[in-house]
């Protein structure tokens, strides 16, 4: 039987790391298959995907043993440029793979790098735009399109050279339901024309109908392989024990419907009145409805990509001033300095918040109760990472480091912007338990998210922002 990807006894340890990221991985992926790598945060999914697109060990140096080939290219021997026409990659954060500030130029870029004639480039751009229905996104600034739109353009750019393999690393972590459906349709279209697709993903419900096999990673090892039918038949307890997310969101969506309301039932501690958001007067983003937040509640803030959720979060915590309206804290107008003093924001991209040389030092920065650092690290599964450099961690581990810092800050207002990107089911439960503790201490917690599973499970009520 033909294989496109073949791995034999692969082990890999990142440079300066004492623990292997992968241990003795052997697998085969056939042409035209769609497979999904699943497992807990830090289990090795992303590392193995980096072997498939040539980023490891060339860009991410480390010690590689065994063999991993993609269409005959041997990881560790083949140069990165040899992978370019064969493997297309889509990352969790599309901003990290953009080379141009214009969407049309971004699509043309792979073809230009490959020496394609200008007329052929224009024709190929037109073909891909038509294939993925991107006409409305062409000739746009990449700074003025939503996260979901950026991901669609990144996906199309990855397909420009007609690769044999597409590798997608948590592509839905920052996408709303509509953008996820669009990405799903793009993946299904590529599978239909025979492209091989590898997904490394925590969120499982959106892609079940296109996945052929599931590869379960655990602590750097491949411990299970399921066909789609076998995976669908797994008991829910098996998924929970494995740290895997839900396969069906029907119950979550009903809970969300019941929890959606603008106003709190308790005494409001934070109030938003007649608020207008924007980066400057010529770039009006949103006129918001009035809303209020009480002490001791967890509120989910939901809405489609680009509606202004992250901008509202930055405004509430004092990083931005509104263009109009007012924000009240305990009934008094709260300026930016007051809001900064009262709040802690866990950003969507936590790399902006990591400054120290070790995980322990990072969590202790600004800690109001440093004696609790070991307790919080234990609760978030970070105790074994205390001396690691934060930038050497996986995306989910970095997220938990900043969440731990928020827990210890003792701020009365905690805002989390897409806190589940990179988090498995077990990590989600760990964070949920800590947020419940903060809730009992009277903290106000605002969670900005597209994650229906998280919102239904964590939040007391939901504020749904709409056009």
Short names for language-model regions:
Residues 119-137, 370-385:
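Conserved ABC ATPase "signature" region
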Residues 53, 317:
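Helix-to-loop junction immediately C-terminal to a conserved catalytic motif
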Residues 159, 406-407:
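ABC ATPase C-loop
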Residues 141-145, 149, 389-393, 397:
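Conserved ABC ATPase signature
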Residues 166-169, 414-417:
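Catalytic Walker B motif of ABC-type/P-loop ATPase nucleotide-binding domains
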Residues 61-74, 325-339:
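Conserved ABC transporter NBD signature motif
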Residues 176, 424:
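ABC-family nucleotide-binding domains
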Residues 201-202, 449-450:
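H-loop/switch region of ABC-family ATPase nucleotide-binding domains
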